């Protein structure tokens, strides 16, 4: 079993690296698109804040991913090990592919889809029944995929429209934009910290399940997860940052602030209602909303179509990959 923990640690680090590479765009892309920060500054700031958030505030969400979808307490521990490893590998592969093609997918939905695949594979082999999978949790997640980007888009549209009417149309735009440059950087830093605390669980949750999770997440698991995210941002984070920050619509400081403020507010409201939402989906929706405030022509619809397609296929692809890997492990290992 010690060997499996070592393997899980390596695979978990790989998934955390993927999270950093893809999800760095959640917190810092709009700051890059509006030129509030350079790419080098973004990599340094995001790496530090994501790592800090993951290490010191990542325990609670790790608990949810470890036990919130598949009832691991009802399964033989060897099956839990196979399923969690298969989920980590599948989510990691899919995130790598998406990052290569500059697509901002939800790493949360990747690991959720992978864990669903684990549960369905266990059902197919009569280790679980279909009603033992926690479908109510999955229903809330599915609902969040629709609500969060739409709400983020609407709120960003309203916020930027108010800024334009109350400030930009009345005062010198250069002085207003200068003030919002600093406000946007502060918002981005907060989002990076919050994202690290939430999404590190996508890598550490399955590791906790493999270790026979009983309530206490070891510090080294969170440390490794946070380190993996930081390394991912530093080495490959620029790919998706460019897509969200520059290719959807043109971003100024006020536009970038509006998108980040709308995203943070949407995620906070969802948390108060216990709704698990994707920061990725919410931010992309918010960026689109800001673009629409300038008219439909200012939004790159081809990029938006590619992003939406990647969202739709994430869960079934991650689930199918997990089912295949899990089945091979059960048969051959």
Swiss-Prot record:
Protein name: Putative phosphate permease AF_1798
Keywords: Cell membrane, Membrane, Phosphate transport, Transmembrane, Transmembrane helix, Transport
Locations listed in the record: Cell membrane
Similarity remark: Belongs to the inorganic phosphate transporter (PiT) (TC 2.A.20) family.
Organism for this UniProt entry: Archaeoglobus fulgidus (strain ATCC 49558 / DSM 4304 / JCM 9628 / NBRC 100126 / VC-16)
Top-level taxonomic group: Archaea
Subcellular location, principal: membrane
Keyword Oxidoreductase tagged: no
């Amino acid at each position: 079993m010690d060997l499996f923990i070592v393997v899980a640690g390596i695979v978990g680090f790989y998934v955390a690296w993927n999270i950093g590479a893809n999800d760095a765009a959640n917190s810092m892309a709009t700051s890059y698109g509006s030129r509030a920060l350079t790419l080098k500054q973004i990599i340094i700031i995001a790496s530090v804040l994501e790592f800090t958030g993951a290490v010191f505030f990542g325990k609670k969400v790790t608990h949810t991913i470890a036990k919130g979808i598949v009832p691991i307490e009802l399964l033989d521990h060897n099956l839990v090990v196979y399923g969690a490893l298969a989920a980590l590998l599948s989510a990691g592969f899919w995130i790598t592919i998406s990052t290569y093609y500059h697509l901002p997918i939800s790493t949360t939905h990747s690991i959720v889809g992978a864990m669903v695949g684990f549960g369905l594979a266990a059902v197919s082999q009569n280790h679980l029944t279909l009603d033992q999978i926690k479908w109510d949790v999955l229903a809330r997640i599915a609902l969040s995929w629709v609500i969060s980007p739409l709400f983020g888009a609407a709120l960003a549209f309203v916020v930027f429209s108010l800024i334009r009417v109350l400030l930009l149309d009345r005062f010198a735009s250069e002085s207003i934009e200068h003030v919002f440059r600093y406000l946007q950087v502060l918002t981005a830093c907060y989002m990076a910290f919050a994202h690290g605390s939430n999404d590190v669980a996508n890598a550490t949750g399955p590791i906790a399940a493999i270790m026979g999770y009983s309530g206490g997440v070891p510090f080294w698991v969170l440390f490794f997860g946070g380190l993996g995210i930081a390394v991912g941002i530093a080495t490959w984070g620029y790919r998706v940052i460019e897509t969200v920050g520059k290719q959807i619509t043109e971003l100024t400081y006020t536009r970038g602030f509006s998108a980040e403020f709308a995203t943070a507010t949407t995620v906070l409201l969802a948390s108060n209602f216990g709704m698990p939402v994707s920061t990725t989906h919410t931010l992309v929706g918010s960026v689109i909303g800001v673009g629409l405030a300038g008219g439909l022509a200012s939004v790159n619809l081809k990029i938006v179509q590619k992003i939406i397609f990647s969202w739709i296929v994430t869960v079934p692809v991650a689930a199918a990959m997990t089912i295949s890997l899990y089945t091979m492990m059960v048969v051959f290992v």
